[in-house]
């Protein structure tokens, strides 16, 4: 079973495809959907086109996405909500449903500590998947952690 994990952002969107076969987990691909334009509507189009490519290039079975977190800047929250809405619609059109996990749930699932740092999550992601090289930026590690969180619940 291939699971797509998505860490939505307003500048980049981390993604990871993890394959679960019984108890075995394997990282198939991870990266960023990079947003190049500064115009919101065009950013949303770039994001959804990036998702389209992932859907077409991989036989994805399930999708998991990080739930919104609290931010101090209301403009950031509104912009992120617009991105999440577009991402959610694209996923629903393609798959009919998806799972959402809060940052606390992801940290708890991957590290055993809901207050873990991003660096601790990155360390455990590498360890759980037996990845030797550095995974950067942390948006990618977060997306992998989201996919792993979903895999644990299957």
UniProtKB/Swiss-Prot annotation:
Q: Name one GO biological process term.
A: DNA repair
Query: Catalytic activity annotated for this protein?
Result: Endonucleolytic cleavage at a junction such as a reciprocal single-stranded crossover between two homologous DNA duplexes (Holliday junction)
Any binding details for the cofactor? Binds 2 Mg(2+) ion per subunit.
Q: Which residues bind Mg(2+) 2?
A: 66
Annotated EC: 3.1.21.10
Q: What does this protein do?
A: The RuvA-RuvB-RuvC complex processes Holliday junction (HJ) DNA during genetic recombination and DNA repair. Endonuclease that resolves HJ intermediates. Cleaves cruciform DNA by making single-stranded nicks across the HJ at symmetrical positions within the homologous arms, yielding a 5'-phosphate and a 3'-hydroxyl group; requires a central core of homology in the junction. The consensus cleavage sequence is 5'-(A/T)TT(C/G)-3'. Cleavage occurs on the 3'-side of the TT dinucleotide at the point of strand exchange.
Family indicated by similarity? Belongs to the RuvC family.
User: What is this protein called in UniProt?
Assistant: Crossover junction endodeoxyribonuclease RuvC
Query: Which species is listed as the source?
Result: Aliarcobacter butzleri (strain RM4018)
């Amino acid at each position: 079973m291939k699971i797509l994990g998505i860490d939505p952002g307003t500048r980049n969107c981390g993604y990871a495809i993890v394959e679960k076969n019984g108890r075995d987990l394997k990282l198939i691909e991870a990266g960023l959907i990079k947003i190049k334009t500064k115009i919101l509507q065009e950013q949303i189009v770039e994001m959804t086109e990036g998702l389209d490519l992932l859907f077409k290039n991989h036989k994805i079975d399930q999708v998991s996405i990080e739930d919104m977190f609290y931010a101090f800047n209301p403009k950031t929250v509104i912009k992120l909500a617009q991105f999440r809405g577009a991402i959610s619609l694209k996923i629903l059109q393609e798959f009919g449903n998806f799972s959402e996990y809060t940052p606390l749930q992801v940290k708890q699932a991957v590290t055993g500590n809901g207050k873990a740092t991003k660096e601790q999550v990155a360390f455990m992601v590498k360890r759980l998947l037996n990845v030797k090289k550095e995974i950067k930026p942390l948006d990618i590690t977060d997306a992998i952690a989201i996919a792993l969180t979903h895999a644990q619940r299957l």
